[in-house]
Each structure stands twice: as structure tokens, then as C-alpha cells.
Amino acid sequence: MSSIIVAMLLCAGLSSPLVIRQSCHVQVAAHTFYGFPDNDPPGCVIAYDCGRGLTAGGAGTFNDPLTFASAPGEFQICEVIYDPYLRKYLRMEDSCDSCNRDWANKVWHIDIWTGSSTVSGGNDQVNCENRLTPAPQHKPIIRGPGPNLLVDATPLYVTSVCNAGSVFSSYDAQSFC
């Protein structure tokens, strides 16, 4: 059935699939972070091409969302969400083993990309990822966000610099919808 709809859209002159935005709502998800040194395998390669090839990255804006990983079926591939804790837009572009284990128990989990797509920050970067991980880990995210939410484009990690101060623990998640 879906292939018939796609064929009808292509015949109607639409060269790319329609993206139907879901309604905005709040979802609580565990937050963890990953990057070049602890990606599996180490490096910047991601599972899904959502417009930048198979390379993790992004600034966190609506037009350049930061990569996040999750379990298959938890989010739509290439789905864009907004994270008030980071004040960044994120796009589901990768998979995550710990997310898979959590999702098997119906626990929502996002693993957010940090750092460079070309250089490993080694243990310094992994330590930064641990500092960025909130306690408690479960924070609200916004699914189906509008394009004009407040963004902090400060990189989470740049060689030897952990921007753990660029997180925002106090907010009313519902106000973002």
C-alpha cells in the first residue's frame, strides 16, 4: 500500500517523499553521550544517512541537528527532536547497544553525539561525556518540535574543552510545545 502512495506522489510531480510532522509532545528519555572514541567501531560512522552521509555531526540547530543514537523502532530514522536540557535539535541517525537493552524494557533512551567527526578526544572526551550525562539520566525531550526553539550552538566537546556548563537543568518541557 505504501509503495502505491509513493508511486502516486512521484507521478504527481513530487520528487521526494512528503515528511508529515507529528504533533508536538513531551517524552521522557534517558540521556547518555558518545563520540569518536567510544563509537562502535571507533570513529564518526553512523548507521543512517539523513542528509550528511554516514558521518555523525551537527551544530544542534533546526537546519543542522546534532546526531543522536537510539534503538530501532524507538524513534523514526531521521526523526528530529528537541532537547531542552541541551537546547539543541537532535536527529536520530545511529543505533546504540545500551539503548537496545533499555528499549527491550520499554525505557526510552537517547545517546547524543559529542565532539569532532575527524579527531578522537580519547579518555578526555569520554570523561566529558560522563560529565554531560545528567543525574537523574531521565529528562524530557520534545517530539515534533517547531523550528524556532531556543538553541545553544556551543559544541559539547572540542579538543580538551568540555562544555558541561552548556546544559540547562531547569525548564518547563511542556512550554516548548
What are these regions (language model features)?
Residues 1-17:
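Cleavable N-terminal signal peptides of Sec/SRP-targeted secreted and luminal proteins
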Residues 13, 17-177:
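Secreted/periplasmic proteins
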